[in-house]
Amino acid sequence: MSMDLSQFHHQLSARFASKTAHASDVLTSDQVSFFEEYGYLAGVDLLDDDQVEMLRGDLAAIMHPEMSGDPRFYEYNFNESADPSKVLFHALGAWRVSRAFHDLIFLPRLTACFRQLLRGQPRFWHDQVFVKPAKDGAVVAWHQDYSYWTRTVP
């Protein structure tokens, strides 16, 4: 078995850190106010094109059917759709398998953004990867996650 990257609680390479400078205040006060009023924030550029391509490359490797037996995944479903002509890939544990997904959660610019929005230190709970191809993908039914994630404090 390959190395379980969850054993490392820091970035493992400069693939992300060197491309995005650390900033204590990534968001404007208007963006933070919008989040506090509406509960979401869209259109925040946190990754550059190279970082997105690294994630896409690692995603393609993760989605390879031979990965389905990798014990580092907490959950792995190549297709959760009831319709075999649709695609709904779903996996938990990508950060344990992929250096790009691992290093993403320790990206200083990303964690600084979370600190601003949460007004406190973020805590990584788990990762979840859904892939639903455009015009081809299945759907995830509307739901509220609070019934699943009932913790509001550590």
Where are the regions that the model predicts?
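Short, glycine/small-residue-enriched coil/turn segments at secondary-structure junctions
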Residues: R151-P154
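Non-heme Fe(II)-dependent double-stranded beta-helix
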Residues: S2-Y38, V44-W142, Y146-W149
